[in-house]
């Protein structure tokens, strides 16, 4: 008997016990109704004893419903613990110490003194209360003939960061821990006793449903445990339950596969950016190759976080998958530099969109208590993609330097299979995706267009685009270049001011990407620390690999081996802080020790030389990356802790998004420093060779070729100037490492200011 057969057998046995329990509870309720009706008529002591004997006889015959301890005590009912009920073994039921009537009242969420009054009401009132709009909407999600995405991807119920229910099954749970979920498609009356499902919803009045609120979705399982949920019955066979859990696991696997290939694609572009730019003879535009990817990645996350409020998730998933697959194909087939830049923009937009959708959809599939395990699995998957990327690139590397194109084509067939599986699951049942827009949908769309989010996205996009153009493009050769530069700088300043005003305005406190600057000052300093830490990483990783490739002349296999410790840096950096760091403890000294040690590693990176020992090649990038990973995890946890509770489900995507924004600024400034330093040093050190009899015209050609392609330096550069050119590259990399040290210093200052604000707030709370 296989594992699946044993699971089905256990589920069938459990379903039989549940049905028996339901029938016995109905019998108890019927008997109690008779007792209540007879209570109005004076009875003798023999009749009362006979009724009590019947109740005890029924309770003794029930293996799932225990008898009450004291029948005379009818006091405040105890709330039913849903997790306890579902966690009981199959051969024994939940232990309930209250009387059967109190048990009924506790399941319904009513006090004991009001239960009798409700029983005297006509059945029509109970039916009206039971048949709520929320209960009918849950039926779609509980219907196992429908795909698990049908209820969350319908255009009538678009997914947003404010509508993240707690699911009954974790996407990364073990196969042995399968919860039993049952469905009900009929309205239940108050005369029947119901079984509480693992994940019921919380009814909320219409006044509480706002455009930025959770609406009728419970914020935590505690709301359900407090008795606020309406009872409903669910009936589903064990085969359908196993099939539904299999669907959810398949979907979670597909999303993690996308995350793996996104990480692999990102690592490839970060590692061989200088090699790609050299092949296109655009080495001085090295930063543009990476900044275009990071910029489109951040914009994709912001846009899809907003579109998820007004559009169907099915459509958004299709667009995101198509963008990522198309970008990989264009990266493989691009023959010109600007075509490749466009391909990286498409890939980055698709990757950012998939990350935004994954962070929100996976929160629906996993319970709040299990979100840490889901995030841990995602971090391990991401780390594996980062490490495997350079090794996959080495498989297709050739002596001509064009093998890196095939590395971008690797994710395409796997992503096509993923897309086919997800689309077949989503569109297996007819939905209302192409239905007519309702007035509610149009009103929501109109309110979304008038919300501050789109203005924030627009101003931030213009700010980053102009910033990338100023730092990555050569505007000196254009006519009226002074005017163009002044215009771009003006746009940068205006967009920055507008973005700051939108974020600090009290009117726009409810925006999706708001950092809540007016709400808690600690949030802005955590976000500044995250952004500048990403900026520091985006300086040392691309230009650290540039140092390995150009200065040390390492092969792609040797480069992949030097970067293999990055996996342990990511995993250890995340787990050491998330599982062993007390987030609310007074760990100020430990924070500064970690920050100071990481800052010293950044300073040590500035002293790299032409001949670096092999053991230092393994740790010169991995150790600063480890410290930065720990700092990023710490700041991210602090941001989640102090962010508004109703926005916590999307705070992870917001952190990654603004990290990408900081990385865009960091790589742009790093590329600008690298290019300017390289041009200046080559003119200072190469042109003096004219005194030795070399023509200035030939020396200028050497400088031009050296700034356009590092491959030309190693293959065709004259021997008399080769060592000088390598020294110029080394000094340019050192200057970029100095810039990364400055960025990380700002991160340390942000942590210091955060701790000062935190200490003041704690002192104020203690005094009050």
From Swiss-Prot:
GO terms for biological process: basic amino acid transport; transmembrane transport. SUPFAM superfamilies: MFS general substrate transporter. It is a multi-pass membrane protein. Residues 274-282, 332-334, 397-406, 469-481, 544-562, 609-617, 675-734 are vacuolar. Residues 1-252, 306-311, 358-375, 428-447, 503-522, 584-587, 639-653, 756-768 are cytoplasmic. Residues 110-121 have a biased composition (Basic and acidic residues). Glycans are attached at residues 480, 553. It is found in: Vacuole membrane. The chain crosses the membrane at residues 253-273, 283-305, 312-331, 335-357, 376-396, 407-427, 448-468, 482-502, 523-543, 563-583, 588-608, 618-638, 654-674, 735-755. GO terms for molecular function: basic amino acid transmembrane transporter activity. The modification Phosphoserine is found at residues 62, 99, 106, 160, 192. Signal peptide: none annotated. Residues 132-159 have a biased composition (Polar residues). Residues 9-40 form a coiled coil. GO terms for cellular component: fungal-type vacuole membrane. The keyword Glycoprotein applies. Residues 34-172 are annotated as: Disordered. Belongs to the major facilitator superfamily. Transporter required for vacuolar uptake of basic amino acids. This is Vacuolar basic amino acid transporter 4. It comes from Saccharomyces cerevisiae (strain ATCC 204508 / S288c). The lineage of its organism: Eukaryota, Fungi, Dikarya, Ascomycota, Saccharomycotina. The gene is VBA4.
